[in-house]
Amino acid sequence: MPLNNPITSALLADPEIFQQNRLPFHAHFADQTSPEMLLTVSLDGEWNFRYAKNLTAPFTDWDTLTVPGFIQMQSLQKSGQPYGTPHYVNTQYPWDGHEKLRPGEIPQDYNPIGEYQRSFTLPESWASCYLRLNGADSAAAVWCNGVYIGYTEDTFTPAEFDMTAAVHPGENTLTVQVYRFSSGSWLEDQDFWRMSGLFRSVELFTKPELHLEDVFVKQDFAPDFSSATVTFDCKVSGAGTVSVVFNGQQQSAEVGEPAEYDSGVVFGKGEADPDVEEDVQDVSFTFAVTDPALWSAEQPNLYEAEIALLREGALVERTGLKVGLRKFELKDRQMLLNGQRIVFKGVNRHEWSCRTGRTVSREEMLWDVKNLKAHNVNAVRTSHYPDDPYFLQLCDEYGLYVIGETNLETHGTWQKLGADGSDEWTLPGARPEWRENVLARAEAMLERDKNHPAILIWSCGNESHGGKTLWEMSEYFRRTDPRRLVHYEGIFWNREYPATSDMESQMYPPVADIKKFLAEHPEKPFIMCEYSHAMGNSNGGITDYTEYAYEEPLYQGGFIWEYMDHGIAMTDPDGKPGFAYGGDFGDRPTDREFCVDGLVLPDRRNTPKMDAVKAAYAPLKITLTDTEAVIENRNLFTDLNAYDLVFASSVNGKPERRAVLRADCKPGETVHLLFPFALPETGLACMTVTAIQRAAKPGIPAGYEAAFGQVWHNYAAARLTLPAPQLVEMDCNIGVKGKGFEYIFGRGKGLVSIRYNGVQLLDDTVRPNFWRAPTNNDEGCAEPFAFAFWKTAGLYARCDNLTAEAKDEFVTVRANYTLPDGQTLPIDFAIDGAGRCDITMTWQGARTELPEFGLLFPLRRELTEVSYLGLGPRETTADRTAGGKMGAWSYNVRQDFAQNTPVYPQECGSRTGVYRAAVTGSGLNIGIGFAGDSMTFSALPYTPHELENARHLYELPRDDNKTVVRCAAFQRGVGGDNSWGAKPHADDCFAVEKGTSFRFTIQK
């Protein structure tokens, strides 16, 4: 079918033509029905589809694609990937290096068009027909029966069009062309995969002659919150009765007089803007509420409201709303929710599904919300665009604070290779041709989402520098919706319009820098819209930030970057499932694995980083001494008596005694509770106090563990004295053996054999180890370069001398190692008659920092079952122990690695605070034990060097070749303040100096 008014490249590139015939923005109605007719028809499902490389290229033959969905994600599933592939870049634009372009220009050679087409039958009862595109990336044009309907940019807000004049009874043909690049692409330089398509639902809808066009629910409160007034500002078309029922009250009004109404239609250059008159009237209803049940993340109370439209007493249309009553304000330089100082314990959340891209199912959204609530997260920043309305509905219902962010990021127009390179091309600045395009994005978001109580703050976008247009946007927000605050981080880069943001917002500053800034600039509250970069094995030091929020009133929390890895599900060369990241589809330029930077893996499995988040964001801080628990209630509206406080003692991980207490403690206060019984004084004695939620809340069942605190002491057990083992000294080897054990040390090699009960446990020689597989954060601050010596030091340390001495009940073998720089490292192996081997390695050189200090044991492949006494149950690091609980834990080496390792291979799997560990195998009937004083322990299928050499998990060797155990005095913290230069905090950057020693024991 021929299409009139075809779209031209000039139109796509023109920032002043960003929509044509688009209907006015309005609130999203999740529940609008009519007894007379079906108001909405979904067009989701299979569409006919064809593809062209650019505007002048021929189209392919017709195929089918699914709506909603991305063209490139579905192309991956087709032979030859005929419709292109996803392309990942961070701040650089995807055309950088391919075509020389500036704002106002778009790619000409590669600007694919996806043409969707399907037929529909107009319901007989419909007197009007409208189309709603809920999300089209990056621009779309619509035709019905070949007649041009309209054009839209702004990927993440709905575009509605009136097709009434073009439809006819019976079957109609709808055509939508989606363009990968448009002028809007310059404004959508978010850190994500670049793709195109109809990625949110497509709907037809009709309007009854009496119709609710829009509603804005507004609230005001008495100073003590003892009462509230709730106003429903409605826009209604048609004549009849409007009835609003709220809080058991009902009000009604008659409408019917026509009024001039600005349609909001924006036309392209050269087109006249006709006068549009519709029978739309404004009508308001105000209700009084006594003792209102306020909305918060802790108590997401929602009232039901119903707006009914009637004609001659008969119901024509019904709209249901859920209303949350809450007051968010800036007072005395602090942000207050319902009168209380708020601390944002948040995450940034891109919309993502590893199989469908930014087309996220309702089930995935619900999982996200419940998962965030289960980890004490109370806030989400919709980075960096308006989310699907259903996600916001869930935030209302389950209780999450939201920063609603405008679909705007122009990072690549001003930041060049990490530095501020702003110039005349920086967008939006004060460039007049971009002004309306930018401001319309803010209007579309606010109008759609204005009735969500979860949204506390409007954000002007992300990383778009500064200037007058952004200030105008902030003023629009304040003028239209004064009951919310306005956020914009970019004033940090450009202070020309500081009033753009009601708060100081920065990204990734260390706590020390925040303290310094607030000491010098205490005018506004301070949040971090991004912090604790979660790329790879990260988020070290996160608790430092949370604790500061309770020390400095002006610092009110932040949002971790980010919630989820953006890996794409794929099948690896071995036929196994895996994940792809930037560059894996040949996409260039690319920022490679920078897209896998989340707290959860691409398939929504929680990483151990989430354990630390849950602990850092806990609503209670529980600190234990040897005799009492000190509990600080960090809730805003929940008393401590909402929790059962479980006191439990254990010895060596085995439960001893248990008691349940309850206590009153108001929000913001602290209580001291004496232990109901004494802490034991034997073995590894531990007292744990756990706060268990007594009643279910939305998303959180009764019995949920909200917080815990621990104290423990390790009491050494008496050691039996046995006769010394037998020493066997020969030309090539030294042996030490006794009943059920034998150790062999090779001259020039070191410890080469451990046999317990006749079973060989080693796969290779035990070696000193100073290296860990570099993490993304290590690479970002060039630590592999700085510490390169330590990689070779462990690999090539030479055992120059081996001596043995039998004395008292021990045989001690000393292995003297020489490192490549000539430094020496003696390691003593003191073996008693029971086969216990006390190992002591002592540093002899100058003071130096290094990644790790310990020994590496390559064990037989059968040894895969680990049980240990230490922090668990999952990985902890030197700077990420929060969330680790002292106790007895167990895991399978291969399963633990498969379930928890980052998409990009790097150091992982360590356990800190370990006192004892055992590694066994099902077929050997024997294992090897390790014991130390709060050491760092890991058991992996790979050496650090094997992990380092792989860029994807499928590039690693088979996982059943061996088990690599490492016992270390320390391993350097993983850091996480950012991933491009920040080192771990000073306390977590360990060093050795002359005399530093590490002692631990191995035994059967």
Question: Could you describe each region identified by the protein language model?
Answer:
Residues 2-35, 73-76, 147, 186, ...:
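Extended substrate-binding grooves/exosites of carbohydrate-active enzymes
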Residues 71-74, 83-89, 180, 296, ...:
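Beta-strand/loop-rich accessory regions of lumenal/periplasmic or secreted enzymes
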Residues 127, 167-171, 289-302, 680-686:
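Short glycine/proline/serine/threonine-rich loop/turn segments at secondary-structure transition edges
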Residues 144, 227-270, 283, 305, ...:
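Beta-strand-rich binding/interaction modules
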Residues 3-7, 12, 16-19, 33-34, ...:
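Accessory beta-strand-rich segments of carbohydrate-active enzymes
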Residues 116-118, 157-161, 259-261, 281-287, ...:
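Short strand-edge motifs at loop-to-beta-strand transitions and within beta-strands
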Residues 190-211, 566, 575-624, 634-642, ...:
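Catalytic cores of secreted or luminal carbohydrate-active enzymes
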Residues 82-87, 92-106, 153-155, 163, ...:
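An acidic-aromatic loop/edge-strand motif
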